[in-house]
């Protein structure tokens, strides 16, 4: 025991803690040197007991009133326990004792940052910059403040300075990617990370963020290459596998994506998001039983995963089990009632079940949420047309054109409805507009009303634009 604890050497942290706790039990007063007090404070911090650590700082300040370090420690502990006024008092005392100590201004800046007193935070961080030997974390906090102020350009500047001081600061690398994303400056992001990689080729975080930037620019092959480098450097990098899977999905490489998504399970527990992503891949491959199995795994892990509930509905819809699919579409809608895709699926399923009034209401909701959904305008008007509500169908398409004046599909559909309504002159005006917009799509007019093939006037006009 004596060999383990080296009794008699007060600098041994365990010995100091034992003496301190003995003093408390005996309600006595023992003397400890400054280093011993620091060791005792750190012991309680590591034990996640800030209250006892604070008690030690009181004894330390009492025995070593001119040691600023204990007032600084005390301030940190007051911040950790949300006692901000007391933290400010401790910092003022420390500043009186040691005004050139950078930690005083860094901690005060942290408190002001949490209080959203942005300028006060910046003033203290700037003061700390002039005093600190290592500045990358201070520069990072200044960047955070500018983000809170919505000034992402300035945040980028400070994040770059942070990385100049410490190229391995992972937080700065990720925050910089976030800022470039908010600013929609993906090309600048790519340029930065490529230059960074030239100097730090083994930075998995840089390769990962480069992959994300390529992804956002729809450069999916390049993003996959970047994720592969990130994985090569850090083979347990689950997020890189997941995002690589997403890129493969964008390239319609669903079977590969499934395998990559499943690789994440080797390095982190399965999540509802990953199960849902795998389910979507199986759905795209029309392997509906497997898709449904993974969607069910997703909602079991995360009942709030609305896309997975929706996915179950899609698999049932595919199997023409429309009534069952409606139940799951509504489960998704309960979680996200502003999702136009969910409303569209409900409208379509209700149409297939001949629930036409309900389908019409659902389509109205789709168009309220997403007035640029061309297919929804076409389908809604088609339901009305099938019920001989020709005027209403024309009215719906007219509203669709107002919201989507460049959509040739809507103009061609209007031609069909106007001919059906025997409004021939107006129909020909819309036909000219449709052909001017996109003559190659004229076939959709005949697909909807095949009998128009026999109309020589229409055929002649179309031939003028397509020959």
Residue ranges and their predicted role:
Residues 35, 69, 103, 137, ...:
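Start-of-helix register in tetratricopeptide repeats
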Residues 63, 96-98, 131-132, 165, ...:
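Structural marker of alpha-solenoid helical repeat scaffolds
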Residues 73, 107, 141, 175, ...:
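Canonical tetratricopeptide repeat
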Residues 46, 80, 114, 148, ...:
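Register position in tetratricopeptide repeats
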Residues 60, 93-95, 127-128, 161-162, ...:
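Canonical positions in the second alpha-helix
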